[in-house]
Structure formats: C-alpha cells, structure tokens
Amino acid sequence: MATTGDDTLTVTASDYIQHHLTNAKMCSADGGIAFNYACQDAGFWTWHIDSLLFSVGLGVLFLWLFYKVGQKATIGVPGKLQCFVEMCVEGVDKIVKDSFHGKNAVIAPLGLTIFVWVFLMNLMDLIPVDFVPEAAKRFLGVPYLKIVPTTDLNVTLGLALSVFALIVFYSIKVKGIGGFTKELTMQPFNHWALIPINFVLETVTLVAKPISLSLRLFGNLYAGELIFILIALMPWWAQFALSVPWAIFHILVIVLQAFIFMMLTIVYLSMAHEDH
C-alpha cells in the first residue's frame, strides 16, 4: 500500500520501482563483509538480509503467539486471538483428515506452520510501501529494504525445496528405495522397454512440484507488490482511490496463496505415502 505523494516523482519512475524491488544485501568481499552497493556483482553468494530478518522474525512471532495462546487457553468464552488460533488449528486439521490418506502425525503441524507462516509473510504486503523502507533509511542508514519475504524468489524457492525434500524422504521411507525407483521407472508405461521415457516423464513431474510451488507464490505476491508501488507513483488522491480497493482485493490473494501452498504440500505428501 502506498502513502507517498508527488514528492516521489523527483526521481524517475523506473528508479523508484527499482529501489523498492531491491533487497538489502550482504556478501563476502576482499576486505571482509560488504553490504548493498558493494554486492552488485557478488552473484550467487549474496545474502538477502531483509528477507532473512523478516521471515525468521515472523516465524518466531508465529511460534511465540501460538505458544502463548496455548498456555492461556480457557474452556470458557475464548478471546478473539484464541478464536483465530483455534480456527486455524481446527481448519488445517480437518483439511489434513480429508486430504491426507496416510498415517503421519507430522503432516497437520507442518500444514499449520506453512499456512500461518506464509500468511504472515504475505500480510506484510499491506504495509505502505514507503513506510518501513523510509524509516530504515532515515534512522538506520539502510538504503534498501524489502519487507515482504514472499516477494523474494529465494524465500519461496527455499520453502518449496524443503517440501520437495520431505516428498523424497517420505517416498523412500514409505515405499523403500526399490519402490521409489519403480515409481520413477515403471509409470505411466508398465514395460521395461519404456523405462527411459518413464524416468524422464516422472522426473520432470517430480521436479516441477517445487518449481511450481515457489513460482506461484512468488509471482502473485511480487505482482501485488509491484501494483502497490505503481499506485505510490500517482498523486495522493489517486493513491487513496486505488490503493484501498486493491488492498481489500489483495487480502484475498494473501490468504488464498497461503492456503494453496499449504494444500499442495499436503496433497504432495499424501501422494508420497501412497502406492500407485
């Protein structure tokens, strides 16, 4: 969401957009640790410290919040926060019971963690685009700061690769190495002569899961953030007229993308527990 006015037009629109889409970076240089401008050519070995800070911080907030609510839970009339937590827990538990057909006590807590964590990271997109970055620049001297972790492909890909690792782990644990290998080589065509074709098809299908998971979440949140930034370039009266409706619509995107990421994770892990 945007709050800036005509003063943002003192820089070019492309500069403004580029500035808000650039992460705070840390990298290793010849003289030791370098930050931001010095990391332009660091390549792969660059840490997006803002994405790490906000994603870990929101994860800790989620754990602390649910822990406190669990400690203070009452059997009487619950408060609003307890109602929200109970709704999340019961909703995810029902989804797991309906969608997951194996036996694994980890799936429901994992689904809850993914949903709430991704939801909180997405929710940061509703904070005005200039509010936190401008405060960080003025008071901390930080030139770049992105506060929405899920607009960073590194974060969404990291989440998706974690899910992918669980898919492979449980596929081998439940079916054994032989069963997992057979799944990759004897489907969809159950003939030894077609093993190479089966292997290519099944490998592509398997690898496509984390790629689609990460790109779907990243693409939707990145596009939403970009629209907020474009609205921030407009006059103040246009900002209010456009940002409020877009923010209301974006709430649906925030919740829906968290739900989709959780739901697909549960479905993929359910498939990993099944024999085809």
From Swiss-Prot:
TM stretches of this protein: 47-67, 107-127, 152-172, 188-208, 226-246, 247-267
GO process annotations (BP): proton motive force-driven plasma membrane ATP synthesis
Keywords on record: ATP synthesis, Cell inner membrane, Cell membrane, CF(0), Hydrogen ion transport, Ion transport, Membrane, Transmembrane, Transmembrane helix, Transport
Record Pfam families: ATP-synt_A (PF00119)
Protein's UniProt keywords contain Secreted: no
A GO CC term attached to the entry: plasma membrane
Signal peptide positions on this chain: none
Subcellular location, record wording: Cell inner membrane
Membrane topology classification: Multi-pass membrane protein
Keyword Ion transport: yes
GO molecular function: proton-transporting ATP synthase activity, rotational mechanism
NCBIfam families per the UniProt record, alphabetical: ATP_synt_6_or_A, PRK05815.1-1
Subunit structure: F-type ATPases have 2 components, CF(1) - the catalytic core - and CF(0) - the membrane proton channel. CF(1) has five subunits: alpha(3), beta(3), gamma(1), delta(1), epsilon(1). CF(0) has three main subunits: a(1), b(2) and c(9-12). The alpha and beta chains form an alternating ring which encloses part of the gamma chain. CF(1) is attached to CF(0) by a central stalk formed by the gamma and epsilon chains, while a peripheral stalk is formed by the delta and b chains.
Protein purpose: Key component of the proton channel; it plays a direct role in the translocation of protons across the membrane.
Family in the record: Belongs to the ATPase A chain family.
Protein's recorded name: ATP synthase subunit a
Source species taxonomy: Bacteria, Pseudomonadati, Pseudomonadota, Gammaproteobacteria, Alteromonadales
